[in-house]
Design a protein with these regions (language model features):
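Conserved AdoMet
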Residues: 2, 11, 49, 53-90
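Non-catalytic nucleic-acid substrate-recognition regions in nucleic-acid-modifying enzymes
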Residues: 2-47, 78
Length: 90
């Protein structure tokens, strides 16, 4: 895992260990993208839209899925897949 200077490998590992829901990972991804000053604009309006797309696509879900799905718990493998994409994106 490579990480930006602000988002460390430990931070990413902590996310897998401690975060639980899709909502948690969208919020975490927004924070990572902002901390790494990631440019958005290729189809995403802002960091929230980019984070939502990244997380939902990783889980093979429509970004416009019912809001109740955001409170679904994730498997460790799903969490790791999201963190791996965050690492690549930042």
């Amino acid at each position: 895992m490579e990480a930006s200077a602000l988002i460390t490998k430990t931070t990413l590992a902590d996310a897998v260990a401690e975060l639980v829901t899709i909502r948690d990972f969208i919020r975490f991804t927004v924070s990572c993208l902002r901390s790494a000053d990631v440019h958005v604009g290729h189809g995403s309006e802002d960091h929230f839209a980019e984070a939502s797309a990244l997380v939902m696509q990783t889980l093979s879900l429509q970004w416009s899925a019912d809001a109740e799905i955001l409170d679904a718990k994730l498997l460790r493998s799903e969490k790791q897949a999201i963190v791996d994409l965050i690492d690549k994106r930042i």
